[in-house]
Amino acid sequence: VMSGAVDQNDRNTAILFGDGAGCVVIGEVPQGYGFQSFVLGADSAGGPHLYLRGAALRLPEGTEMGPHLTQNGREVFKFAVRTLGDSAEQAMRQAGMSTADIDWLVPHQANIRIIEAACERFGLPLERAVTNLERYGNTSAASIPLALAEAESQGRFRDGDQLLLAGFGGGLSWGAAAARWWAGP
C-alpha cells in the first residue's frame, strides 16, 4: 500500500503510485512447466535514488515525520531500463530461452516508457507486454502479481506460454524469472 508512504505534496511521486496487493500461489506443476530460472540482485550504491525516508528510524514519541518515498526519477529510469533488460536476458539464458521464445513479458508496472524500452530491446510488440499501469499506477511489489492475475482472468495466457517476469525496486534491487505457464487441470 503506497498511499501511506508517498508525500501527497511531492509531485515527483504522488501522481505515480497506486495502492494494490497481490500474491501468487506456487505449487506442483507437470514436468516442463513453472519457473525455469530466477535472477535476483541489489546494488546499494543506487540506494540514494529510491528509498523510503525515515522508514528505519526510531523517532521520539510525538515526532511528526512519516516515512516518505524519495526518488530521483531520472536515475531510477536509467537504472530500470538497464537492469530490467539485463536481468531478463540473464533469466532467459539460464532457462535456455531466446527472445524469440517469449510469449509474454510481465514487467514491473513502474512507467510505460520503461516497459516500451524493454519491449524494444527484446523485439516484442507492446501488445505482448502485460500492462495495467494506466489503470492502477505503480503498485510497487504488487504490480507483477496483479498483472499476472489480470492477464490470467482475461484468458490472455495459454497453456505452455513462455513468460518473462522482470522487476526492480528500492535500494536499488532487481529480479527476473522465466516461466512456462500451466493452465491447470
Short names for language-model regions:
Residues 96-101:
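Short, surface-exposed connector motifs at secondary-structure boundaries
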Residues 8-82, 86, 168, 180-185:
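Condensing-enzyme catalytic core mediating Claisen C-C bond formation in acyl metabolism
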Residues 2-8:
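Glycine/threonine-rich beta-strand-loop-alpha-helix active-site module
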Residues 1-2, 30:
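Catalytic metal-binding/acid-base residues of hydrolase active sites
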Residues 81, 85, 103-185:
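Claisen-condensing/thiolase-fold acyl-transfer catalytic domains that form or cleave C-C bonds
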Residues 2, 42-43, 112-113:
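Short, catalytically relevant binding-site loops at active-site mouths
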Residues 87-95, 147:
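Stable alpha-helical structural segments in soluble proteins, enriched in small hydrophobic residues
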